[in-house]
Design a protein with these regions (language model features):
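Conserved Rossmann-like nucleotide-cofactor binding loop
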Residues: 15, 38, 148
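A conserved beta-strand/loop capping segment in the N-terminal third of enzymes
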Residues: 52-104
């Protein structure tokens, strides 16, 4: 680099790319580091709420141009019970490949320098260290490494979760007319003992099935677990009948759902999953990524590096309500004794589902 940048952004997912867009449009010299050489289809984040779509629009990305599937309703399945409720506003199902590509292109167009294949591994004395031994320095660093752990920044979930950690799984299901008819314009949540599965159709017509399951339930190969779940839960089994098992199942270990932290040092802005990891059934992971980026950019413009601690405290405070509610629903949903009553309540009081959908957004 010929001149020292004003800021380094680690990670070119929605949080990092969103921050790079805002910073670069404000005239800052930005270096955006991305560990992968090509944009991939990340495991999490296929659901974009109405609020997330509005944040994308503020960055100049029209949700309609992403070509996603319109999502108008949410379905719950628990045992023999089910519910279906209209969402407060229309959402979208879109692949992370499509979303991340659009955000990265916007960041480059805004003037950010995107450097691919650079794996940042640690922060020491305000400098970013990379796997190949390089050291990059800037007055401010925006840490947006997603769900990947980052050396020196442990993310410890609650004690009960540490005893039985959560694994994230994802199965891509090819487009099929019968599956389209089954799922339609819904995002589905299939609740089961010690876990849940979320299903939504995406931009290319495929369906994204993501699971959060405790390690004690995994008991072996992910495919074997999915097949058992399909046998035990007929509605999920109907969907899994369209699976192409040759595609393989993506996995990420020890996801610290429910963790959040409001502590940082001057010059370090922690974004997205590096600030807090909301249970994925809330469908707000991408919302938090973009909202944290927006808030960090605003704070930086007013106070540069020194604004980081205040930004982090304020972001953690904003996370309090949606995280508490999402954690409660998660615990109820993965417990067989409470999942069915929860679903019955959703069927009897759809207004409560819509209220919860709004309350789990980051205000």
């Amino acid at each position: 680099m010929s001149t020292r940048p004003d800021a380094i952004v680690i990670g070119a997912g929605p949080a990092g790319a969103g921050a790079a867009i805002g910073l670069a449009r404000g005239g800052a010299k930005i270096v955006l580091l991305e560990r992968s050489r090509e944009t991939g289809d990340a495991l999490c984040g296929g659901f974009l709420s109405w609020q997330t779509l509005a944040r994308l629009a503020a960055l100049g990305i029209d949700g309609a141009t992403l070509g996603g599937q319109v999502v108008r309703r949410v379905r719950l399945f628990a045992g023999a019970r089910s519910s279906e409720t209209m969402l407060p506003e229309a959402a979208t199902g879109v692949s992370r490949l499509r979303l991340d590509s659009a955000l990265q292109a916007a960041a480059v167009a805004a003037g950010a320098g995107l450097e691919r294949g650079v794996h940042a591994t640690a922060l020491e004395g305000g400098a970013v260290q990379t796997r190949d031994g390089a050291e990059l320095a800037a007055p401010s660093v925006f840490l947006a490494a997603g769900k990947h752990g980052f050396r020196g920044f442990p993310r410890e979930p609650a004690a009960w979760q540490r005893e039985d950690p959560v694994i994230g799984l994802r199965l891509r299901m090819p487009q099929a007319a019968a599956l389209d008819r089954l799922v339609g314009d819904a995002v589905e949540l299939h609740l089961f003992d010690r876990g849940y599965a979320g299903l939504v159709r995406q931009d290319d017509g495929s369906a994204n099935l993501c699971l959060a399951v405790h390690k004690s339930r995994l008991g072996g190969a992910p495919e074997a677990l999915l097949r058992r779940l399909g046998d035990d839960h007929p509605r999920l089994g109907e969907r899994l009948a369209f699976a192409d098992w040759s595609r393989g199942i993506d996995a990420i270990g020890h996801v610290p759902y429910g963790w959040r932290d409001g502590v940082t040092t001057p010059g370090l802005f922690r974004l997205g999953d590096q600030a807090g990891v909301i249970p994925s059934l809330a469908g707000e992971g991408m919302g938090i990524a973009l909202a944290s980026a927006e808030a960090a950019v605003t704070a930086w413009r007013h106070g540069t590096a020194g604004a980081a601690p205040g930004f982090q405290r304020a972001l953690a405070a904003r996370m309090t309500r949606p995280f508490a509610l999402a954690n409660l629903i998660w615990r109820l949903g993965e417990n067989p004794r409470t999942a069915s009553p929860l679903t019955a309540c959703a069927a009897a009081a759809p207004w409560l589902v819509r209220l919860t959908s709004r309350a789990t957004r980051l205000g």
